[in-house]
């Protein structure tokens, strides 16, 4: 089961990815986490990435693609994975397709979580995560079962992203619609796209995604 979740900031991709990980036992592959791990491990591609980052430059698509490729070869990805934050552009999508094909693999599905722009500001400004394990929560829609205690690891320390505020929502949406939303048409043309209504409550969104996954 090899998946990509698409949707604007605040659509609930992180929450749903977390639930897929817990239910199906496949890893969620975050480009940021993979970059840091490759640099820490001192792999060849990690050294290339470190040199670029130390110079204060953005890591190129070819380096990110190489790190994703390296990560997918790890044993815990044998049953599948969820790509988180990659691909973001059509160029990256083409590179991902070519990389998977070279390994004899293909994407199982690309799931688009559709949410109206009008509600995204409320969703984004209310988000926070466990500082220890990264579990996601929301002031209104997804509070811990015990107030102030993480459901997953029991930590009492939480944090909010600096850019999770109303002022940056418009800018982040503009970037999404310019760079990432073209992927919806790209994967639709390949017969991989599945859409779910992200305006529903979290449990209904999860159920709709599971209905899609059950047919893969």
Swiss-Prot record:
UniProt subcellular location: Cytoplasm
Lineage: superkingdom: Bacteria
Region feature (LID): 126-163
Function text: Catalyzes the reversible transfer of the terminal phosphate group between ATP and AMP. Plays an important role in cellular energy homeostasis and in adenine nucleotide metabolism.
Quaternary structure (record): Monomer.
Primary residence: cytoplasm
Pfam family, one: ADK
Residues engaged in binding Zn(2+): 130, 133, 150, 153
Name the UniProt record assigns to this protein: Adenylate kinase
Binding site residues for ATP: 10-15, 127, 200
Catalysis: reaction(s): AMP + ATP = 2 ADP
Pathway(s) where this gene product acts: Purine metabolism; AMP biosynthesis via salvage pathway; AMP from ADP: step 1/1
Organism for this UniProt entry: Rhizobium rhizogenes (strain K84 / ATCC BAA-868)
Keyword line: ATP-binding, Cytoplasm, Kinase, Metal-binding, Nucleotide biosynthesis, Nucleotide-binding, Transferase, Zinc
Free-text comment on this protein's domains from its UniProt entry: Consists of three domains, a large central CORE domain and two small peripheral domains, NMPbind and LID, which undergo movements during catalysis. The LID domain closes over the site of phosphoryl transfer upon ATP binding. Assembling and dissambling the active center during each catalytic cycle provides an effective means to prevent ATP hydrolysis. Some bacteria have evolved a zinc-coordinating structure that stabilizes the LID domain.
MF terms in GO: adenylate kinase activity; ATP binding; zinc ion binding
PANTHER family on file: NUCLEOTIDE KINASE (PTHR23359)
Alphabetized InterPro entries for the sequence: Adenyl_kin_sub, Adenylat/UMP-CMP_kin, Adenylat_kinase_CS, Adenylate_kinase_lid-dom, P-loop_NTPase
Family indicated by similarity: Belongs to the adenylate kinase family.
Gene Ontology cellular component list: cytoplasm
GO biological process terms held by the UniProt record: AMP salvage
Region called NMP, residue ranges: 30-59
Binding site for AMP: 31, 36, 57-59, 85-88, 92, 160, 172
Enzyme Commission number(s) from the entry: 2.7.4.3
């Amino acid at each position: 089961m090899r998946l990509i979740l698409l949707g604007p900031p605040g659509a609930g991709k992180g929450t749903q990815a977390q639930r897929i990980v817990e239910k199906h036992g496949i890893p969620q592959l975050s480009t940021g986490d993979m970059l840091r791990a490759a640099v820490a491990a001192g792999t060849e591609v990690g050294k290339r990435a470190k040199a670029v980052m130390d110079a204060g430059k953005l890591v190129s698509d070819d380096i990110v693609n190489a790190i994703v490729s390296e990560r997918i070869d790890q044993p815990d990805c044998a049953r599948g994975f969820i790509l988180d934050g990659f691909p973001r552009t059509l160029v990256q999508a083409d590179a991902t397709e070519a990389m998977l094909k070279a390994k004899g693999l293909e994407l199982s599905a690309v799931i688009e979580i559709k949410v109206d722009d009008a509600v995204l500001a409320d969703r984004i400004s209310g988000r926070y995560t466990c500082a220890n394990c990264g579990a996601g929560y929301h002031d209104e829609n997804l509070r811990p079962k015990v107030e102030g205690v993480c459901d997953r690891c029991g930590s009492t320390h939480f944090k909010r992203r600096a850019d999770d505020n109303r002022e940056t929502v418009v800018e982040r949406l503009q970037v999404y619609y310019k760079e990432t939303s073209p992927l919806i048409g790209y994967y639709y043309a390949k017969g991989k796209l599945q859409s779910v209504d992200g305006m529903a409550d979290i449990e209904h969104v999860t159920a709709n995604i599971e209905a899609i996954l059950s047919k893969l």
